[in-house]
């Protein structure tokens, strides 16, 4: 469970959030002017109440005319001020949230892969969606109330001082009590808000798991188990919201009680101290203003919940923004394309440094060579492929491309030299064309896209789709079969035409006929480029120039398919087992 914000971090969070307001200061000034008009109209209403009392006691034509017209004037001023203030502040708040949410999303795209391993995607999504919404609430409703009701309190308080400053100073004695209540409840609000954020992240995480694994849930009869897990996290979310609302109501009632006691005491003193100087108008003006000040004070107390939730949400977003991005200290650029010579020199790596996944790897892959990595599950095959584009850096040793350490390449330059097709195919909710010509390939012409699709044996089903290349695939390519999705991903890699190609279980989701066609296409595309193949089906890598066998993160055998069979080692055992299964 996440910890509440330390008190010493609250003000820095406020300041950092307010820094997003700076570019929009002009609209903020307009908002303040508008709410100043609104506050002035409120004080004018208190004065009008007193004037109305004097008019009833001593009516004259002039007074009757004034009390008839004044309400209309006050309402016009109040409405104008409300519109100016609310429109301007809403505009500013939406700009702040727009910029903040974009900053967070762009930052997330640049996080190292290790962050995605440490944090479930649902928790990151919760920060961007839910936490940003808390900032929106603080940036719109909360700030509007703070400025509008704050200026109203100042206006009414100034009016009370003008009416009778001595009695008003007595009324001020309740302010420290109100401040004490606000301070205590603010700490509680932040603590509960942090728990609500944690509960919301759990809800998002469990929803994602249940939806993505819906097939497994049904096959294994896990509906009741998943429902029970979701009920628990959902109950926690509801429980924390009830606590937050209870604290909010309690603080509001206590503040109103203090104010009511103060007003009652002042009313008693006002009547007894004014004596003969007491007038109906003066009394009504003072008591009306004192009564009116309760409403903005109540709203300022209520808004404290939104402010604290907004600060908590902002702190969560800033925590994500402060997460270190991928380090890109490389300066080496590539004129056209690398040759594709790869060297691993004493490479060790572990997602947990205490438990290395690969240990002291030493091998070289020549340009244009096709090398297959095989081994039991967890042997480190996919880890090796993930280190080539620097998704992860070695804990020890170094990896070289054309004799140059990977860290010396600019990240974008390095990744431009690599195409990858993994077991987990990622397709976007976009057209077939934009899924093949993705990212830096988006300027590709249709002829190149169609050629890549044909080479991947994908064109035969693409041209049968209702809109061809313009057909929308839906989220994660839901409209396509597993084999079709994989062929789209292969077409994307073919279109990139990179000198280094990584195939991580690239044919795992294909049926035998599709796999046969894909193997023919891959044999052609592998020519002239360095290819690293990871496959569970050993029959798919028999034609590799070299096969490297990994066991517990170490390279134990290497050679051609026939050479390894003759050694009668681990590869032979795996091949026989694999062959019998197929």
Swiss-Prot record:
Involved in lipopolysaccharide (LPS) biosynthesis. Translocates lipid A-core from the inner to the outer leaflet of the inner membrane. Transmembrane domains (TMD) form a pore in the inner membrane and the ATP-binding domain (NBD) is responsible for energy generation. In MsbA the ATP-binding domain (NBD) and the transmembrane domain (TMD) are fused. SMART domains: AAA. Keywords: ATP-binding, Cell inner membrane, Cell membrane, Lipid transport, Membrane, Nucleotide-binding, Translocase, Transmembrane, Transmembrane helix, Transport. Residues 29-309 form the ABC transmembrane type-1 domain. It is a multi-pass membrane protein. Homodimer. Its main location: membrane. This is ATP-dependent lipid A-core flippase. It is an enzyme of class 7 (translocase). It comes from Alcanivorax borkumensis (strain ATCC 700651 / DSM 11573 / NCIMB 13689 / SK2). It holds the Pfam family ABC_tran. Belongs to the ABC transporter superfamily. Lipid exporter (TC 3.A.1.106) family. Its EC number is 7.5.2.6. The chain crosses the membrane at residues 25-45, 64-84, 142-162, 165-185, 253-273. It is found in: Cell inner membrane. Signal peptide: none annotated. One of its GO terms (molecular function) is ATP hydrolysis activity. It comes from the Bacteria. It catalyses: ATP + H2O + lipid A-core oligosaccharideSide 1 = ADP + phosphate + lipid A-core oligosaccharideSide 2. ATP binds at residues 375-382.
